[in-house]
Amino acid sequence: VEAAGIVDVFVKFISTTESEGVINNNKLVPELYKFSYLTGRGSSRKGSITYKDNIPIRLTAEPNYDDSEIPSLEFLEEYGSTSNDPYSALLVHGSYSDPCKFIAQGFDGLRSFKTIFVRAAREEKIKIGEQEVVTSKCIGYFDPMVGYKESDFLDEISKPGSVRYWFKYFDSLDLWAPVKVIIDTPLGGFVLKGTALKN
C-alpha cells in the first residue's frame, strides 16, 4: 500500500502486510498478521501478531514499542478476541448477501476500531485496470474504540459518509473483498484501488 493522490504530497509512506487465517463457521479466524512500513521521514517498523484460538497472544515489533505502549495479555484479549487484524477486517464472508450489513472490527495490537456502514449496498460499475467490474458500494465511517489520539484526522474519518468501499463477491472464496476504498482525510481522499482481478 502506498499513499496516493494529494495525500502523497503530505504523507509519504509504504506499507506491506500479510494476513493468515482460516474460515470457521462463516467467520474469518486470524492466525498470524505481519506488517511493515516505511515513511518519507525515514522511520520504519516491522512486526507481527500471533493468535491462538482467535485471540492475539503476542505482539512483536522491531524496533520495539516503548514500554508504556506494549500491550498486556489482558488488553490483547479484551480488544482482540472479537476482532480481526486490520486487513482481514476488510473482508466479509459470503453468508452476507449485503456486505454493508457487516460491522467489521479491526485490531492492530494497540488500536481497535469498527467500520460501520450507514445504508444498504448499491450496485455500481467501476473500472479495475481494463476490466469493468460490478460492485456493491458501501458508505460508512470508522468508530475508534481504543488507542487513538484526538486529531483532525480522527474527527474526519468518524463522520458518516467518510468511508466508501466498493465490494466484489468472489465465488471461489465465498468472500466479499473491497476492490476500491476511499477514506476522507483533512488532506483529501486516501484511495486504495486494485490494479487487476482474478476470480
Residue ranges, per PLM feature:
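Active-site/ligand-binding surface loops and adjacent short beta/alpha elements
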Residues: 53-114
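Acidic, serine/threonine-rich low-complexity disordered tracts
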Residues: 1-51, 98-199
